[in-house]
Amino acid sequence: MKKLFGLLSVVLVAVICFAQPVDAAKKEKRAKYVFYFIGDGMGINQVNGTEMYLAERAGKIGVEPLNFTTFPVRNFVTTYSAYNSVTCSAAAGTALATGEKTKNGTIAMDKEHKAPVYSIATKAKELGMKVGIATNNSIDHATPACFYAHQPDRNMTYEIATDLPKAGFDFYAGAGFVKPEKKDSVNIYTLFDRAGYTIARGNDDFRKKAAKADKIIFMQEQGCDMGSLPYAIDRKPGDLSLEEITQGAIDFLSKDKKNGFFVMIECGLIDWACHSNDAAAMFNEVIDFQKSIQKAIDFYKQHPDETLIVVTADHETGNFALGTGKYELNLKALQHQMVSKGQLSKKISALRTTHHYAVTWEDVKKLLSDNLGLWTKEELKESYEKDLRHRYDKAFSNGEQEMVKSLYAEDEPLANTAVQILNRIARISWGSGGHSAGYVPLFVLGVGAENFNGKLDNTDIPRQIEALMRDIQ
């Protein structure tokens, strides 16, 4: 009995001795480098559909995993706002940034509009971390704004921009600013200059200026659309990409690694494509988004014990459905779409202008064949061709065109109908041009990833990130 007691004592002492260093090691691990990726409008079906689309393109049934869907933690998240079952990007952005529910349309203020609520980006700054905010929309758009601004209405874009230097973060990037001036007010670029920000326009300009800049705002070149970068499907050589912005953020924020960094990177064009019910543009945005995420994964491989990567979405857009009744999909048909619906619309408008309405049906068929693969790559039902011919007759009569409006676009009816038909051929459908209350996905890799298991609300995510960032100094 004494021998047994003695043996148990030795085992107990050994367990205690070995347990202490392990616990200490766990306590030492903090999220020194935090990547927070938000796919605006990227619901579960947007992700699953992209993977199935990639699989079909490779000649198989099933999924071709995206890099972030292989992360060890895969979860789903609720998105309702303070007063609505269906959120807007401002309220969802506030929840993801601050951990607080608010009223739809509100940028990082409480639901009564009485006080500001502060983002984990602000808290990271207080911890001495470098901070970056990036998007492929305008920098004053709802999601990025929720991390640095406090305004009662997301449409107050000038006021949102004036909050940027007040936050004092190190790196901002995106298309630009949609309202740099306001009557009887100071131009926002003057405010940025006074606050010590370097303005870089285009990737080459950024590379020239970044090394010497203390704080920087990285935008598209002069003359480009300040509302958004081009869709991935429309991108031309020399166009700025979210991947380049992401690499720029990593390089700039890594100049001083003493206290680490926090960076939020939004792919806002997933949402825009979904508002337009443009499946091919949306799939291409998700595929392009993973290129940005790969930059973070590459960084993680160099700092595996100090890096946290979180990928999620603010809400689902479009009530996107995979399947239209028949038990099959034909997603590979979407690979024949060469441009976004918006660019197709511009091509149709240009055809009308250059030909002064003297456009033949054969001219239109060639345009739709070249850009969507209709007739040449995908056979058309008689009813589909009839619909297109009807739209052609209206589009090229001398009557006034009534454009098809979505939240961020106005498109030619012929372009809208043609893309709808290609979607039907692919056997996917859209329930609306707005948001839905559907779950959004969550994928996590790195330090503390296990803390994101279990059903979560969007407000849980920033709270957990903050907990993992604490005490890194």
Q: What kind of region is each of these model predictions?
A:
Residues 38-42, 98, 131, 437:
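Short glycine-rich loop/turn motifs that provide flexible caps or phosphate-binding loops at active sites
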Residues 18-21, 25-26, 291-294, 298:
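Short, motif-level signal for alpha-helix interfacial/capping segments enriched in acidic residues
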Residues 1-25:
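Bacterial Sec-dependent N-terminal signal peptides
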Residues 31-33, 42-47, 52-94, 144-145, ...:
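A post-motif C-terminal structural segment
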Residues 13, 46-50, 100, 106, ...:
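Residue-level recognition of conserved structural "scaffold" positions that shape functional pockets
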Residues 93-169, 176:
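Extracytoplasmic mature domains of secreted/periplasmic and thylakoid-lumen proteins
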Residues 29-36, 41, 45-46, 51, ...:
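Active-site-adjacent structural elements in enzyme catalytic domains
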